[in-house]
Every structure is written in structure tokens, then in C-alpha cells.
């Protein structure tokens, strides 16, 4: 059985995803959805002796808490897969086509308002083509349309919460 505990900011999309999986044939007793704060729900789940593995996406401090909780358990070692938002980098050499680089940068850095764990965070461009690439990226970024993500013309939707907004402002 998989117990899915989404981030507190995403209960609606998690519900839709689980409903779609159930509609596609995944049995309800094989996939269950639990909502609530990670500090209580997540901690209680990790502490259960029946837990055979944990997959976590979130902050490094919380991943470390989960790791310590699992290590303190009696019995067999419980595997932990933790994705904690590493730095997704792109290295561009002098043979790259600036148009392709600009498109890839904009797609990776700005889709999903840059909130995916795989969003581009670090761009290293060979000095021979850097000026042209930067100019193209700036031009492409200026063309992005911010707005309601339900509208097809929108390229850049809202961020998930006030904390994410504050992080962008820094």
C-alpha cells in the first residue's frame, strides 16, 4: 500500500491525481491519500513499523529529520529516497546554437513558475557565445505572458504561496 502525503499547499491537485489513478484501475487499498501537516502526519507515518520505504520531496532539513527517524527504528533498514531541490545546472559550450539554448533555458527556468525541483537554477555559458545567448534569453523572457494558468496564452502562472513569493523577491 502506498500512503501519499502531499505538501500542505497542494491538496487539490493531489486529490485529482489520486482520483485519476483510481479511475485508471489502481485499487483504493493500494493507494491512499492523507492530508495534513508534515510535522504530525508525516512524522506519524514514518514512525510506523509497517513502513517499508519512504520517498520524500522537500527541504533538506525535513529530509534529515526523516532520515534520523528511520535510522532510530528497530528492525530492518528502511530505504529513503529524498529529492531536496538540488541545483539543476546547464553547461553550454561554444558550439551550441543560441536559439536552442535560449528556448531550453526559458522552458526549464520559467515553466511552472520555476517551482519544479528540476527547474534550471545555474547557467554556465562559454564566453565566446555568452553575450548572444544572454540577449536571446532576455528577449524570450520579456515575451513571457504572466497570468491565469487556465488560459492557453499564459506562460507563467502564480507561485504556490506567500513564502515562495518572498523567496523570489529576495
Model-derived features: where do they sit?
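Conserved small-residue-rich beta-alpha loop and adjacent elements
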Residues: 1-28, 85, 99
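General beta-strand structural signal in soluble alpha/beta enzymes
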Residues: 4, 33-35, 56-58, 80-83
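A generic structural signal for short
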Residues: 5-6, 30, 55, 157-160
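Flexible, active-site-proximal loop/turn residues at the rims of small-molecule/cofactor binding pockets
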Residues: 8, 37, 57-60, 129
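Conserved donor sugar-nucleotide recognition element shared by glycan-biosynthetic enzymes
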Residues: 10-13, 38, 164
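ALDH superfamily catalytic-core signature
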Residues: 23-25, 47-48, 53, 60-170
Amino acid at each position: 500500500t502506498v500512503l501519499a502525503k502531499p505538501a500542505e499547499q497542494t491538496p487539490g491537485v493531489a486529490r485529482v491525481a489520486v482520483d485519476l489513478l483510481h479511475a485508471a484501475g489502481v485499487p483504493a487499498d493500494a493507494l491512499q491519500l492523507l492530508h495534513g501537516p508534515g510535522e504530525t502526519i508525516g512524522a506519524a507515518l514514518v514512525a510506523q513499523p509497517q513502513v517499508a520505504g519512504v520517498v520524500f520531496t522537500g527541504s533538506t532539513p525535513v529530509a534529515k529529520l526523516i532520515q534520523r527517524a528511520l535510522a532510530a527504528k528497530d528492525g530492518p533498514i528502511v530505504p529513503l529516497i529524498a529529492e531536496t531541490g538540488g541545483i539543476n545546472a546547464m553547461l553550454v559550450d561554444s558550439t551550441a546554437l543560441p536559439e536552442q539554448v535560449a528556448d531550453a533555458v526559458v522552458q526549464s527556468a520559467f515553466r511552472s513558475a520555476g517551482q519544479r525541483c528540476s527547474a534550471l537554477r545555474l547557467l554556465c555559458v562559454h564566453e565566446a557565445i555568452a553575450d548572444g545567448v544572454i540577449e536571446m534569453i532576455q528577449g524570450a523572457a520579456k515575451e513571457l505572458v504572466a497570468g491565469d494558468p487556465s488560459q492557453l496564452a499564459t506562460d507563467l502562472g502564480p507561485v504556490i504561496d506567500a513564502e515562495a513569493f518572498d523567496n523570489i523577491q529576495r
